[in-house]
Structure formats: C-alpha cells, structure tokens
C-alpha cells in the first residue's frame, strides 16, 4: 500500500509540473492578452515581457520596463525602500490610417480573471491570450502582424502589390 501511495504522489507531482510547463509554454506561444476592460481603453492587448510589458494600441507600441530584482526584494520584504526604477518608451507608426482594424487570432484554451477593486465595472473575466495580433490596413495596402516565434516577439509589415513601403515611418518617444 505504501508503494502505491508513493507512486501516486510521484504521478501527482509529475502531472503538476507538466501542467505548469504547459501553462508557461502557452503564455509564450500565446503572448497577446486581450483588453476586456482591465487596461486603459486605448490598449488593444498587452504582452508580458521579462522585466516589463508591451502595451499595443492602434499604431503604437508602449514598452514599460522596471527593475525586476528590486520588485522581488520589496515583495519578499528584503528592503524597506519602496522605490522602483522604471522607464518607458513608445514606438509610433507615423501617419497611420484612422480606419485600420485590429484583431487577435488563435485564442488560447486558458484564460485569466481580473478583479480590480470592488467595482464590477473594472472587472474582466475569461480574458484569453492569443497567438497573434494583426493591424489590418495600418497604411494603405500594408498590414502589421505581430506574433511569437521561439519565445521572441516578432512583427512583419505585409506590403501588398502596388503599395508603397516608404509610407512606414516610425518615431520614438
């Protein structure tokens, strides 16, 4: 009987680690977290990055980075200094179409719930992750497609025939 219990414990432990691995693998495979009200309205999706996050808006990427070690020290009560060094910058696609469409593709099986405060208007439930995000017609005849490949975030500018790739111009803030 003891041996069966030991095997059961090993099996449960193995299943737990496989589940955790599956969840983390899916987060990197499906990095785009849909905004269902848990983020400012102009944000379409968020991507968690090592030491920060990427917020995707129409024609704009906002990167936000912070000191991971300091955050861990505060969380684990290893310091009384509550200040965290952080910085942000924006990548802006200049002169984009006002009527571009943004959509997320390939919904994950898993989801998250966000309960922000006591006001249900700020709650977001069943927030799925997605494999890719497309901003269709960001410029006339040009689409922007974002996706994850081997754990890295990528984006392609898809230029249709007879479209001018010189329209794509970026500025940084």
Q: What spans do the regions from the language model cover?
A:
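Bacterial Sec-dependent N-terminal signal peptides
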Residues: 1-28
């Amino acid at each position: 009987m003891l041996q069966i219990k030991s095997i059961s414990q090993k099996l449960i432990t193995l299943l737990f680690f496989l589940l955790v691995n599956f969840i983390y693998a899916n987060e990197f495979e499906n990095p785009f977290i849909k905004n269902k009200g848990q983020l400012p309205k102009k944000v379409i999706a968020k991507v968690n990055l090592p030491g920060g996050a990427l917020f995707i808006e129409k024609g704009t990427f906002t990167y936000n980075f912070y000191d991971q070690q300091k955050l861990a020290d505060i969380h684990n009560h290893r310091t009384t200094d509550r200040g965290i060094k952080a910085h942000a910058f924006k990548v802006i696609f200049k002169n984009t179409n006002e009527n571009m469409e943004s959509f997320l593709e390939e919904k994950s099986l898993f989801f998250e719930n966000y309960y922000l405060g006591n006001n249900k208007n700020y709650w977001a439930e069943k927030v799925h992750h997605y494999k890719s995000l497309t901003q269709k017609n960001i410029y006339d005849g040009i689409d922007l497609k974002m996706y994850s490949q081997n754990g890295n975030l990528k984006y392609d500018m898809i230029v249709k025939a007879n479209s001018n790739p010189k329209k794509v111009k970026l500025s940084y803030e």
